[in-house]
Amino acid sequence: MLKPLGNRVIIKRVESEQTTKSGIVLTEKAKEKSNEGKVIAVGPGRLLDNGERVTPEVKEGDTVVFEQYAGSEVQVGEDKYLVISEEEVLAIVQ
């Protein structure tokens, strides 16, 4: 498993719908990548110049919305994850 460093967050994307509202089935190429996902792991937080750490606002298990082109995609086995900085998280879904 991946262990994020600093203010980074590991996210598993939530798959987007495979059919449109009108019933059209989308192929893998036609589907847009979702910018919503579940937080799998959270780093210890950003380190400040004075040596203190900023506690992350997100936690494991949160469903979040993040910037469209955020982070780097990483594959571990069959699973794909997104590694992003916490600043790229826009909101927590409640």
Swiss-Prot record:
Keywords for the protein's UniProt record, in alphabetical order: Chaperone, Cytoplasm
SMART domains: Cpn10
Pfam families per UniProt: Cpn10
GO CC list: cytoplasm
GO molecular function: ATP binding; metal ion binding; protein folding chaperone; protein-folding chaperone binding; unfolded protein binding
Compartments (UniProt record): Cytoplasm
InterPro entries hit by this protein: Chaperonin_GroES (IPR020818), Chaperonin_GroES_sf (IPR037124), Chaprnonin_Cpn10_CS (IPR018369), GroES-like_sf (IPR011032)
Biological process, per Gene Ontology: chaperone cofactor-dependent protein refolding
Subunit structure and binding partners: Heptamer of 7 subunits arranged in a ring. Interacts with the chaperonin GroEL.
Main function: Together with the chaperonin GroEL, plays an essential role in assisting protein folding. The GroEL-GroES system forms a nano-cage that allows encapsulation of the non-native substrate proteins and provides a physical environment optimized to promote and accelerate protein folding. GroES binds to the apical surface of the GroEL ring, thereby capping the opening of the GroEL channel.
Family in the record: Belongs to the GroES chaperonin family.
Protein name in the entry: Co-chaperonin GroES
Name of the encoding gene: groES
